[in-house]
Swiss-Prot record:
Alphabetized InterPro entries for the sequence: DBL_dom_sf (IPR035899), DH_dom (IPR000219), FDG4_N_PH (IPR037742), FGD1-4_PH2 (IPR035941), FYVE_RhoGEF_PH (IPR051092), PH-like_dom_sf (IPR011993), PH_domain (IPR001849), Znf_FYVE (IPR000306)
Keyword Hydrolase: no
SMART domains linked to this entry: FYVE, PH, RhoGEF
Protein name, UniProt field: FYVE, RhoGEF and PH domain-containing protein 4
Amino acid sequence: MEESNPAPTSCTSKGKHSKVSDLISHFEGGSVLSSYIDLQKDSTMNLNIPQTLGQPGLTSSPPRKFLPQHSPQKQENDPDQTQGQHGCLANGVVAAQNQMECEDEKETTLSPEMAIQTAAASPDTHVLNGERNETITDSASSIANSHDENASDSSCRTPGTDLGLPSKEGEPGMDAELQERENGVNTMGLDTLDQHHEVKETNEQKLHKIATELLLTERAYVSRLDLLDQVFYCKLLEEANRGSFPAEMVNKIFSNISSINAFHSKFLLPELEKRMQEWETTPRIGDILQKLAPFLKMYGEYVKGFDNAVELVKTMTERVPQFKSVTEEIQKQKICGSLTLQHHMLEPIQRIPRYEMLLKDYLKKLSPDSPDWNDAKKSLEIISTAASHSNSAIRKMENLKKLLEIYEMLGEEEDIVNPSNELIKEGQILKLAARNTSAQERYLFLFNNMLLYCVPRFSLVGSKFTVRTRVGIDGMKIVETHNEEYPHTFQISGKERTLELQASSEQDKEEWIKALQESIDAFHQRHETFRNAIAKENDIPLEVSTAELGKRAPRWIRDNEVTMCMKCKESFNALTRRRHHCRACGHVVCWKCSDYKAQLEYDGGRLNKVCKDCYQIISGFTDSEEKKRRGILEIESAEVSGNSEVCSFLQYMEKSKPWQKIWCVIPKQDPLVLYMYGAPQDVRAQATIPLLGYVVDDMPKSADLPHSFKLTQSKSVHSFAADNEELKQKWLKIILLAVTGETPDGPSEHLATLNNLPGPKKKSEC
């Protein structure tokens, strides 16, 4: 863009004198704009030109905001004229267009006329506190026209350079940038003063707002009291006088609600109404509250009987149809807001803490020197005492509301709505099934005196859960179990039932154990029989002791842990010999061994299916038949696995039969015999292999499974396969000793006995 040629000095001087004279003659009458020019004149008297022109950040005092006297009618003038007017910045800052004018005026001081000229050069826009306000007037437009008429030569100026300012077209962003800089400095002092003035006004306004809020909430509260007293109470009393139910029940529910309503509607509310009308002359509320606060003691009677009143409403609604009909009819009305009677009964309980909160806020805004300070402080002390009782009742009511929600979630089948019941924790959890290895979704509700073990109910409407078991806190014990296949597990052992549960995470598990422990400890503290609830895994046996049979729910042995009846040792199958659990000891038995019933104390004395042994212990009947002497196969797997040279699952194949997974054990007490079980908890071995004399082949063929080995003797061939090479070598180490009659501890007694036999019998050796 081409730069404008500098204007001659004579033209510039002539333009200045004509403009100054026009401005003085035009604003001699003292308009709003002239006062603004005077302000600019005072602020620029001591400023020199180099400081003003060279440093845009240094400006005069902030200009005052003024309104135009006339509507902007000449804003759509010739663009060239308007553009020249817009080139001036707010607050009297002038930027030189070219170096010649700056050098001519470097040593001159800014005169009042120059300040007037600067302020009037751009009357259309001013930036004040970050806001741009239009200030174009008819008078201001005439100034521009007069300026143009007095210019003798058009060559003395170019568009946008009336006062030596840079052209807008040349540097379009410079104007806005300079305005932002000077506004940041000029408005600082003004903002500080405004903020101080605003804070002073805000405290007074907030005191008025608090008093207004107290009045408005008091009006709404009185309308709720009228609903309780004049609608619910009167309608139910009318129905009671008809003989539908005793009137005494209605009086117990509403207590002294009529007295409370009379106090607020006839005394407190009228006093507040009158005071707010006189607020300009008497801006205080502490004296009213201090005078009437002692009457709030009448709430003590209402709060004291609140729990029983809510429980009575629930009972009457369930058992008396007329009571239910009247309350439901009122609750349908618009004035109730679709809220229940219990909800409206909570209003007086919540009102006292509301007074306390508003009064505390009022004292924070009130100056200690105020005449209302002492009255407000005394009234707060009285109200705080009453509020402490209300807060306790509110907590109980909130807990009761939660109990009602749970009551509905359970299909209104469990009687849990009782003020003595307190919800401690709830949440989803997984239950490890005894009949299979699956984890089933469950939901727990932990209260201060019981645990509800629930099953989710999949329905669009109605209840969400079904209570499967209610386990009492009394006698409950917790065990933190460790299961590699199922992490984050723990066991709840109660008189009614034992549950093995799996949490979603270790943190969730710890939270449940902590909540259960605290509930158990608190329960025993209330009954003065404190004892630790969390015990180590070894502190609680997996099986119920003989003394506790029928008194404590057992832990059920999982179906996949056994393959045969734990009493008669017969193998299970899906058709003729299915699995059953003894409800007394938790063992898995067949139908023959569970064909007994006994009364179990933990199940309320009801008859339950039990095994033969438990039946004899619980009922006291003894079997005269002597127990059979156990054979070699009748050694329990758990008995030998705990004291063995080696034990693990192995794949096993005999002759042309398919591979099957079995539990193999070489016990320390019989190290030359390999016991094979269907599962680790089986009480009887499926087969045994005396290892002495067998040939070991640890080089499997290509058709065999990896990590396999064979035991061969005559026509008997037993094939085994381990899960990995390490486990295979562990087995081979023990078996290679056993086939030669040796043990890890030394020569076997079996081999010594064999060597002492007569000659002919030594043919059995390999």
